[in-house]
Amino acid sequence: MRPDISNIPELPGVYLMKDISDNIIYIGKAKSLKKRVSQYFQSSKNHSSKTRAMVRKIADVDYIVTESEVAALILEANLVKKNRPHYNIDLKDDKRYPYVKVTVNTKFPKIFITRRRLMDGALYFGPYTNVKPVRQTLDMISQIFRIKRCNRRVDGKGKRACLNYHIDRCYAPCNGSITPEEYRNNVMEAVKLFKGETSGTIKELQEKMNIHAIAQEYESAAVIRDQIDALKSLSRQQTATAGNDDSDIIATASDDETVFVQIFYIRDGNMVGKADMSLSWGDATGNIARVTEEFIKQYYQDAPVPPEILVQYPIPEKELVIKWLSEKAARSVQIQVPQRGNKKRLMEMAEQNAQMTLEQSHLKQSDKEQALQALLQLRDALALSTLPAHIEGFDISNISGTDAVGSMVVFENGLPANSKYRHFNIKTVKGIDDFAMMAEVVKRRYTHQKAEKDKLPDLILIDGGPGQVSAAMGSLKELQLDIPLVGLAKRFEHIIVPKDGTDEVVILPHTSEALKVLMRVRDESHRFAVSSHRRRRTARLSHSELDTIPGIGASRKKALLNHFSSIEQIRHASVEELTAVEGISKGLAERIVAHFNKERVENQ
């Protein structure tokens, strides 16, 4: 049934199409609301299939009158962003220039990077074209001002402080170690850096760097040098304004469902960065020029507007969009289609990158579909009640029981989720006992999961035979957890399934995709266990008594051990012998001798 549109005025504004359930399904803007809305209900021969489908669902039309076309364009963009109607072109993954956000409107403010600038009472700095020095500055702020960066709630309930507090990178407001007033003062000191007031901090850092350099502590000096460079880069970005050679190049590539957008950021005539985004076609299937226009309207709501925007094709309402962008930027803005020269070459490069992003998306989708089929096969082969979308794999690595480490890897939808990997330094088992080590690791993992009420895996895979499987099952039974668990032994790739106190062996063809999933999880857990064990062993071997002597870092320790071969020889070396080593000054040699002399006296 056609909605009543007789009372819609012939004025500029925004119209909202609603379905029978009063859901907004499309938002548009018009110079004349009455004329534009009427067009939807006239002959449909010029409408796309999606537009015809949308019109059939329209049960009501609401509208908002604005003072001008530009005001209508701005309101339309804001309403689309807020409501995300089904038939509008939807910017899916909006990767904008980063800002630094300071939540000054909270009791204990945080400082962090964000891609969106909201009207939420917080303080924002940026946008920054280069995020690396911003991250370096935030790391430095953690060291100097000890500002909270984790997501813990600060509710005054006296939580135990996290690691950042113990390494002097946070004042731990979560457990009341600092008052709100003291903490806020610290935050406002840090804020000065983002306001460009960096000269005092840079001067202090340069003095510290010189002290380390004089003491030949070159590694410490290099760290401070990098901090100074980051601050200078941050300051340059903060004070930079758009120059005449600044432009954004927007290119697209598309398939039947999605439009992939590539933006090249050109600043001072040089390419300083790029971003990939994607949009749905909405009701504009096949009309790249219109999709590009909609992208510009959504993207530049809160992204910095350069003097020039280069596009592949002329956009439908170019003059209106230019007027809006120029008002927003408070200067002239141009939208051009490059015809020749360097700009044309850069556009072709952006088009090529957009096409590559499209092809990579197709490959990823194909990988996901193959992984799903493999998981379905695995579910059937092991007679699981649910799809094993979340698999956790365990392995143990040690040398004769020393530096023993257990690993846990996570696969989600058949693919590794690296950020969720964990390693466990073995604590309770002495000597060579892989079974007991496996029992410890599994128990520690799921004791924590049970206590935190975290989601449990759909399947546990143990790298090993019946002994390891039995040990792991024992831990699960102790915790009263019923999680499907299997083992995969390397030699024959037989799957061990514990059932009612016995082990059932499932043999799958080596070509089976289900078996390949388990092998990938098993091999990854083994790799991660070995690498974790090596790190632990290296850390133990590299730690020595020299680490307790001020002025000896990694490079000097290495030089001393290369020269003397052992700590014992260094212990009995004279000042003259020590100064023969590159990087060891007379003062440092005297400190080394004094350290070992003191040790000998204490041991007498």
UniProtKB/Swiss-Prot annotation:
Molecular-function annotations in GO: DNA binding; excinuclease ABC activity
InterPro entries named in the record: GIY-YIG_endonuc (IPR000305), GIY-YIG_endonuc_sf (IPR035901), GIY-YIG_UvrC_Cho (IPR047296), Hlx-hairpin-Hlx_DNA-bd_motif (IPR003583), RuvA_2-like (IPR010994), UVR_dom (IPR001943), UVR_dom_sf (IPR036876), UvrABC_protein_C (IPR050066)
Segments forming domain GIY-YIG: 10-89
Domain (UVR): residue spans on this chain: 199-234
CDD domains named in the record: GIY-YIG_UvrC_Cho
Pfam family, one: UvrC_RNaseH_dom
GO cellular component: cytoplasm; excinuclease repair complex
Family matches, as PROSITE patterns: GIY_YIG (PS50164), UVR (PS50151), UVRC (PS50165)
Keywords for this protein: Cytoplasm, DNA damage, DNA excision, DNA repair, Excision nuclease, SOS response
Function: The UvrABC repair system catalyzes the recognition and processing of DNA lesions. UvrC both incises the 5' and 3' sides of the lesion. The N-terminal half is responsible for the 3' incision and the C-terminal half is responsible for the 5' incision.
HAMAP family attached to this UniProt entry: UvrC (MF_00203)
UniProt-recorded name of the protein: UvrABC system protein C
Species in which this protein is naturally found: Methanococcoides burtonii (strain DSM 6242 / NBRC 107633 / OCM 468 / ACE-M)
Gene name of this polypeptide: uvrC
